[in-house]
Amino acid sequence: MTITKLTRTDLAPDLEAYQALFAQAELSHPAPSLSGDLQPRLFYGLEQLLYTPAVSSFMLVKAPEEPEYLQWLAAETRTLHEPAAPLYGVRYEVTDAQVTLAPAQGAEDNFASTAPVVMADWVEAEQLFGCVRQFNGAITLQPGLVHQANGGVLVLSLRTLLAQPLLWVRLKNMVTRQRFDWLSMDESRPLPVSIPSMPLSLKIILVGERESLADFQEMEPELAAQAIYSEYEDTLQFADADTLKAWCQWVWQNAQQLALPGPAADAWPLLIDEGTRYTGDQETLPLSPLWITRQLREAAAFCEGEEITGEAMQTMLARRVWREGYLAERMQDEILQEQILIETEGECVGQINALSVIEFPGHPRAFGEPSRISCVVHIGDGEFIDVERKAELGGNIHAKGMMIMQAFLMSELELEQQLPFTASLTFEQSYSEVDGDSASMAELCALISALANVPINQSIAITGSVDQFGRVQPVGGLNEKNEGFFTICQQRGLTGKQGVIIPAANVRHLSLSHELRQAVADNQFAIWAIDDITEALPMLTQLMWDGEGQTLRQTIQERIAQATQQETRHRFPWPLRWLGGTSSN
C-alpha cells in the first residue's frame, strides 16, 4: 500500500529554492527577446508569414479575441517586420469628377501606407475598405485599414469576419489578387465616378478562439488548410530557475507597459501561488495578459511605494475572496445550520462525504462543498439503482462511472451469478443535475460499506474516480474541494482526525490556502494521497479489502452466501418446506 500523508510543502508550489531569484534587480529589466522566448511557436509562424516569399498570405492564430491579445500580437509583429524599401500605396487625384491614379511619392500621399502593422478587433465595411463621399458635387476618397497596412500586415479578429461573411469574401479576393477594387457598399447605388483599382500587397493575421477557428475552417476549408497556423500559449511549464525568471520578467514587462508597480521579492510567492491556482498545476504558470493585468491593478490599489509588497498582495487576495465569497458563505451556512445534513464526526453505514465543485453562471468564483452520498442495500435481483439517473438528474459521464464501479465490484467478488442484493445509490439533498465521474470512488466506498454492513468514518471526505481495476484516477477542482470540506470542519471545530483522501496524481494540482496549509502543519487536518481504492477502504472502515483476517471482501462474500441460502430455501412452496422440515426429524 502506498498511502501518502501530505506535508505542508506538498500543498503548494515549493519556492524555497527561488528566494534569491526573487530579489534580483534584473527581473525588472526584461530582454527584448523575452516574448519570442515565451512564445517560440508563434514567433516561428510570424517569421514564416513575414519572410519573402511568404509561405502564405494568411495566418491563423488561436488566441482569445480580446483587444489585449490583438494589441500584443500587433506589437510583436511590428518588431519582426522589416519595412520594405519601396513606398507602398498610391495618390488619388480628383479633378472635374474624374479620378486618376499615380504612384505614391511620399508618406503624406492620401493612399500611401501609414503603418507596417494595423490591428482592429472589430471592423465595419467603410472602416476596412474606405469609402467614397460626395458632398455638393465634390468627391473625396477616404482610405481604409487595408490601405493603411498596404505592404504590411493587418491583424483582425475572426469573429468580426464570421459575423460579416461578405466582408471576408471581398477581403480574401483583394489579398489573393493583390488588387484593391472600389465597390459600392450599396448595390442599389453605384459609385458616382469610376475609380481605378490600386495594387495591394497585404498579409492577414486572423485571431480566434477554437470555436471561431472551427467555424472558419468549415467556411473556408482550403484556405484554412493552406494558411500558417500557430497558437498563443497561455501557460508556461517551469521546472528550473531560468524559466521562472523569464516568467517574472514577463510580469514586470506587463507592469511597465501598464505603468503599474511590479512585485517586490516577498510578493512573488503569493503571486505564483495564485497563478498555479489559476492554471490548476504547481508547475504551470499563466501567460494571460488579462490575468496578470487584473492581479497588478488590484494589488496596486493597496500599494504605497514603487513596488507591490507581499503585504499588499496578501491584502488584495484576501479582500477578493471576501468580496466574491457571499454565495459560498451562504451555502456553508446551510450545512452549519443543518439544513443540509453533512456529518464530520462519527460513523455511518453506507454513507460517505464526497466533494463537489459548485459553479454558478455569472459568478466569478467556483467553490467546493461536501455532498452526502448514501447507499441502501436489500435482498433483490442484483440491480444497481442510480437514483440520479432514474430521476433524470444524472449525466452520461456519471452513468459511465456507475457502470465502471459495478464492473470492478463484480470482478473482485468473482461472482458466478448476479448479487442477491439490490443497491440504491444517491446524492442526498441534490436537486440539480449531477454529472462527472469524480465521485465514483466515493460511491464505490459507500456501496462496499452497505454490502459489508461496515460503517464509514464521517471525519474523512474523499474525491477521485476509479477504473475497472480499482486504480484511482485524477479529477478536477482539488483546491476548491479540499478547502470546502476544511471550512466546514473548521467552523465546527477541528479535531485532528478530519481530512480528505485524494488521488496521488492530483497532488501536483494543489495550491491551497495558507490557513489550510497551517492546519496540516499543526496536525489539525490531513490530506492523504492514494493510488488504489483498496488503500482508501482501511482509512474509512478500519478493515482491509482483502488479505489475512477479517476483510471487507470476506464479509461481503459471507453475506452473499447467507442471502443465497435464504433465497434457495424460500424458493420452495411452504407445504414442501413443511414436509421437508418434518421428514428431517
Model region roles, listed by residue range:
Residues 210, 227-236, 430, 466-471:
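Conserved P-loop NTPase motor cores
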Residues 212-226, 513-519:
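Short regulatory helix/loop adjacent to the ATP-binding pocket of P-loop NTPases
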